[in-house]
Amino acid sequence: MFDKEYVFYGKHADMVRKMTAKLSDEIGRGFFGTNYEIYQVAPFVGWIYKRRAAVDKNGETTKIFPDKMMKGKQDLVFNYRNIMALHFGDKSTEEIMHIAFGLDYKDQDRKEYDEIYDSYVLGGVEEMYEQIFEKNGANSVDEYIRNLYEFIEELNMRLYGTWDDLS
């Protein structure tokens, strides 16, 4: 589990590359520094927005190398367990515990659940990309940054409600 490279394919690879690409000469990096950073955040964005997507094997690829996956394994397993618990929240506690905690070393038994997790990763990639680069017809760095700000504000509202609710 999370001990080999992860590959983004096709349109998702293109989206990940754009989110990690240098925004401009003045801004020497992208919204995300690495593919791994996107992989950490994407499943939760997918869950929050109820967005899942299938693998698109057409086109180019971009990867997260095995050493990076293994270094972050503890965090990735934590993410996986949370997404499984959220996705299967209508099941019994025993079933959730089995799915989220009982299949770590049973790759074949876990395969269908890995595919569910991956669908949230890819759905989250799509949602982040669309929110940042496509919303409001954005076509400049300033507009992308504004969209990112609005996206973060919207995430906050989806998670916590209004600012008044926080006090």
Region locations from a protein language model:
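Charged, low-complexity intrinsically disordered terminal regions and linker tails
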Residues: 1-26, 52-167
